[in-house]
């Protein structure tokens, strides 16, 4: 059993119950670092989990080039903008230019600021930084990519990156 949350309360609850904690930083990064700090500081060991164990969520959009990955990422950006406008719907196809005002662009950039978007090397470096920044024991990744083949390619690249980063930690 895990506790998934995006608040300080969820971090406190996971700590109190001696559960592993997954933080939803893939859409709510604001309290990530403080939540991990609270979780680790207040952790009460349990029989199954003698020490705190943290996972953080990351949107991963990996492609053969940074430009291609940034274009794929526009689907998720549009979805967030549409949600904030009160017009939720299916994941839209990627676009060359986002149709949004400055405030909407700033809000979506903030909400998705923990994402790793780019080529294999760019994403690897970003994920390495995210692990170092958070001290996460695991990452849970998601990729809301419109095109199925591009989504599969992103996960293939992510798996290669996982293997490379795991070998660095040994």
Over which residues does each language-model region extend?
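Active-site-proximal loop/turn and secondary-structure-junction residues that shape catalytic pockets
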Residues: 27, 60-62, 145-147
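Glycine-enriched alpha-helix->loop->beta-strand junction motifs that scaffold or abut catalytic
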Residues: 13-22, 135
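Hydrophobic faces of well-ordered beta-strands that scaffold small-molecule active sites
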Residues: 1-4, 21-24, 52-59, 139-141
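Generic C-terminus detector
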Residues: 131-170
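Internal, glycine-rich beta/alpha segment that forms the wall or movable "lid"
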Residues: 1-17, 33-34
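An alpha-helical appendage that flanks or caps ligand/catalytic pockets
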Residues: 30-136, 163-169
């Amino acid at each position: 059993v895990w506790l998934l949350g995006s608040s300080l309360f969820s971090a406190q609850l996971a700590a109190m119950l001696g559960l592993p904690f997954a933080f939803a930083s893939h859409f709510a990064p604001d309290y990530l670092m403080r939540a991990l700090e609270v979780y680790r500081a207040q952790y009460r060991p349990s029989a199954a989990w003698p020490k705190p164990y943290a996972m953080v969520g990351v949107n991963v959009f990996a492609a053969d080039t940074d430009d291609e990955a940034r274009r794929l990422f526009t689907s998720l950006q549009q979805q967030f903008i549409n949600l904030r406008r009160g017009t939720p719907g299916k994941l839209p196809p990627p676009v060359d230019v986002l149709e949004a005002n400055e405030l909407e662009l700033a809000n979506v950039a903030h909400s998705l600021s923990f994402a790793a978007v780019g080529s294999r090397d760019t994403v690897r470096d970003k994920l390495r930084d995210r692990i170092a920044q958070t001290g996460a024991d695991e990452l849970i990744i998601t990729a809301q990519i419109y095109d199925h083949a591009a989504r599969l390619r992103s996960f293939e690249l992510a798996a290669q990156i996982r293997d490379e980063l795991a070998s660095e930690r040994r």
